[in-house]
Amino acid sequence: MAVVTMKQLLDSGAHFGHQTRRWNPKMKRFIFTDRNGIYIIDLQQTLTYIDKAYEFVKETVAHGGTVLFVGTKKQAQESIAAEATRVGMPYVNQRWLGGMLTNFSTVHKRLQRLKELEAMEQTGGFEGRTKKEILMLTREMNKLERTLGGIRDMQKVPSAIWVVDTNKEHIAVGEARKLNIPVIAILDTNCDPDLVDYPIPGNDDAIRSAALLTKVVASAVAEGVQARAGLASGDAKPEAGAGEPLAEWEQELLAQANPNAEGSAEAAPAAATEEAPAAQTPADF
């Protein structure tokens, strides 16, 4: 069964690119035509590239890897957080802090500080302090939660990153490339395909399009988790030595995917068809 259908892509508005005066010539091969001054993306190619990206993500997770979901623009924030949380992956949907990948040791110290402050609050560590001190500590904790909450359990740099809007997230993409971390991303008509390892030509401005493609990547992660556990029939098994004990969230995911499974080997169902929205032209940023 197809990972996603042409109708789903059309309904989400994934075929709408930017205005013809705002494009990257390197994207020419992904453009089908232009309509009323708007480029139309070739969705047949999109389907092909989705399959390639899906397979890569599934195999990466099956062999113990993690995928960092990145999307800080308003249109992507909700779906990035929801889908990453659904499959237990780290995410950044507020502000990307410079060095989040290339200087992860420092970022990890800030994560430890966040957990320290949360523990203080929960165990009464704020008691006996002045109102001003409590206010300062609370503000610090809230700020850390807002910027780092999505990666609080990330112990090392990810195996790959999923990006919505490579232009807006150019710092994240640049850091990933410095560390040779594969980049999977939506490629709108104003993006540079040379910066992405696994491109998916599509609309990165429409909420429905970003949500649909993020859901596809999350579904690939979910299938990779099942393959890692050896439950997905016909999928390649993890290499010897890669089979770490499943995390609690992974066990819950497997239980949800196989509610009647006592040795069941059924693959996870394909992503549910989304409600068909009216086609819309994305805002030109």
UniProtKB/Swiss-Prot annotation:
Compositional bias annotation for Low complexity: 257-285
Stretches the record annotates as Disordered: 229-285
UniProt superkingdom: Bacteria
GO terms, biological process: translation
Keywords: Ribonucleoprotein, Ribosomal protein
Cellular component GO terms, alphabetical: cytosolic small ribosomal subunit
InterPro entries listed in its UniProt record: Ribosomal_uS2, Ribosomal_uS2_bac/mit/plastid, Ribosomal_uS2_CS, Ribosomal_uS2_flav_dom_sf
GO molecular function: structural constituent of ribosome
PANTHER family to which the protein is assigned, alphabetical: 30S RIBOSOMAL PROTEIN S2 PROKARYOTIC AND ORGANELLAR (PTHR12534), SMALL RIBOSOMAL SUBUNIT PROTEIN US2M (PTHR12534:SF0)
HAMAP family, A to Z: Ribosomal_uS2_B
Family from the record: Belongs to the universal ribosomal protein uS2 family.
Name the record gives this protein: Small ribosomal subunit protein uS2
